[in-house]
A protein has these predicted regions:
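Compact, glycine-rich, soluble single-domain proteins
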Residues: 2-112
């Protein structure tokens, strides 16, 4: 998998960020609080770059695809950046995916 720099039009790129390495590539992970930022993702990301979501501490959260017009692969990581789950999310799906463990990071990319 090839990953490029994360893109997020809603947040100041010079704000609070972390470096995130996955599969030999470095990404910039922005702190996002999903309950307030449901529409982030790929909506205004014309290059469809992968996105990394992270939180200040591990949380239980769920993901859905109600407003997303792409099929996505999503990877869930613990605080040690080890994969603890993944899912393929169908576009405009009403289904929710809720990891059984607390997650610290989630990486979303367009399914190819």
């Amino acid at each position: 998998m090839a990953f490029k720099q994360v893109y997020n039009p809603y947040f100041d790129q010079d704000g609070e960020v972390k470096t995130f390495s996955f599969n030999g590539k470095k990404l910039t992970a922005l702190y996002l609080y999903r309950e307030h930022d449901q529409e982030i993702g790929f909506k205004e990301n014309p290059l469809l770059k992968p996105l990394v979501f992270t939180w200040k501490k591990p949380i239980y959260t769920c993901f859905n695809m109600v407003n997303v017009p792409y099929e996505l692969e999503i990877f869930f990581f613990n605080a040690d950046k080890k994969i603890i789950g993944s899912a393929v999310m169908e576009k405009f799906s009403q289904k929710q995916y809720c990891p059984k463990e607390k997650i610290q990071f989630a990486l979303e990319r367009i399914k190819t």
